[in-house]
């Protein structure tokens, strides 16, 4: 049991397959993060410039927000992992409570008049 203490941590803790998997996962997260930055810049450019017509700017930003929300859920909140069942259940139930609440508040406050 004490024989493993003489080895360095990276050699004793992970196999080569685990290291490759972690590197692949880090690479995916960096790519998704860069994609989210790009989506944010696209939404900023939609508002800052007149490239996109004003009537299409709000739906365009909303579409980008939904895409970014889905990417964040799957890659950073680990919704794609199978061993996060309870966390997934709570996040999904939170979405099902939040969306109707926001829609009801928008209707009550008259925000839907553009």
Curated annotation (Swiss-Prot):
Pfam families reported for this sequence: COX4_pro
Domain of life: Bacteria
Cellular localization per UniProt: Cell membrane
GO MF entries: cytochrome bo3 ubiquinol oxidase activity; cytochrome-c oxidase activity
Keywords attached to this entry: Cell membrane, Membrane, Translocase, Transmembrane, Transmembrane helix
Transmembrane residue ranges: 29-49, 56-76, 89-109
A single BP term in Gene Ontology: electron transport coupled proton transport
Top-tier EC class: translocase
Membrane-related topology note: Multi-pass membrane protein
EC number: 7.1.1.9
Matches recorded under InterPro entries: Cyt_c_oxidase_su4_prok, Cytochrome_c_oxidase_bac_sub4
Main location per the UniProt record: membrane
UniProt keyword Transmembrane helix, yes or no: yes
Swiss-Prot/TrEMBL catalytic activity: 4 Fe(II)-[cytochrome c] + O2 + 8 H(+)(in) = 4 Fe(III)-[cytochrome c] + 2 H2O + 4 H(+)(out)
GO cellular component terms, A-Z: cytochrome o ubiquinol oxidase complex; plasma membrane
Family: Belongs to the cytochrome c oxidase bacterial subunit 4 family.
The name this protein goes by in its record: Cytochrome c oxidase subunit 4B
Species of the source: Alkalihalophilus pseudofirmus (strain ATCC BAA-2126 / JCM 17055 / OF4) (Bacillus pseudofirmus)
Gene responsible for this protein: ctaF
